[in-house]
Amino acid sequence: APSIHKYDCIDYFHVDQHFGGDEALAELSKALHENDMKLILDISINHTGAAHKWFNRDNAFFDSSEGAYQNKDSKERGYYFFEENSDNYVCWCGVKNLPTLNYQSEDLRKVVYQDENSVLRKWLKPPYSIDGWRFDVADVFARNNEVQLAHEVWTQIRKCIKEENPDAYILAEDWGDCAGYLQGSEWDSPMNYFGCGRVIRQFLGLPDLFLERNEILKKVPYRMTAEDVQNRIMQHLAKLPYVIWQNQFNLLDSHDVPRIHNYKTVNQDEYRGAVILQFMLVGTPSIYYGDEVGIKGDIYGDEGYRYPMPWSQIPCSNDTYRLYQKLAHLKKEYKALTEGGMKFLYAKGDIIAVARFYEEEVFVAILSVSDQEQKIRLPLGSVGAARPKENRDLFGKELTYRALDGRSIWMKVEAHQAYLMECIGIVESMGN
């Protein structure tokens, strides 16, 4: 693709030379798999670039005999939405350089995902052997006014992908409530803004990009309460089969939103609490590159969210790195954080507490965005716990609490503070 962002594709069948070409991808895939890592490629099959061979608006890379824009009788004309007897065409969000693909065309379906050498199948096969696809702007894919083919086409796409690799991960960009795609026959997960990223960011008092894009809604200041966070997350999960819960791609930051740690209004303890909550939720935490080392940036535009990784200056011993390192270790080590149940123990005003539990393993995370120190009651017995194991949390924060009845504790929560506690199970406590 000719642009910096690379979403204006001109050739789906080759890797951009800026990224090393096809051979570089094959080598990367081999090295990753040798180290027990996975590889997911990002793609937009909702639209191409106007310079794509199929469209070829300005003859920038292809001869004037090629493409739908130049040749009204070409097969590729049916790949796009053109007005009758006109060169006017539908494009994504009004961006003329991104003409929208028309999945009414059976020929388009064949070349994108059905044929043995189609776009999506090619990269799942050796020597590339990718492990999944991330689909850009999946929420508007295969939709245009009266043309509403999304569920039909996604079902077909899933079938074709899983034929090549049954374990391939289908990740879709959608910022809203997308439960209709998550019933087992279409996506494996959205980029979970709706049930993770957006709610945690709003709880911290940060603007919501999804709402900011709406000229009316962005005029209404709104900060999510703890009750809102609990309700949104549980509303999202309650609509999904449990196996899909486990697939959720839980993120805080991405290439489309400012990094939380670059907001001056969020202190280090609140940021730590946000990351802890991300790791506590059912599903898989997604760490946006550089967040683990506190990469610099700004909050004013795409370039500020996408600073290059400072490979020669990575401070792997700072507090942020140790935070992610510790949480990644816990997530891998304890079944409570992967297979265990999840329950909100407290959600009022500016304080939220959530537990993960499996047999005798119990972890409780607390985040306060309140300006005031408060005391809260935690019903630990409801998740099989009696009390915290230690007088400090897993990051060394002092815990001040009082046991009530063997099943609940009163706990002091400092202003703008976060805690992650490992707790003693009720059965274990009875033996001590």
Language-model-detected regions and their locations in the chain:
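Active-site and adjacent substrate-binding regions of carbohydrate-active enzymes
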Residues: 1-432
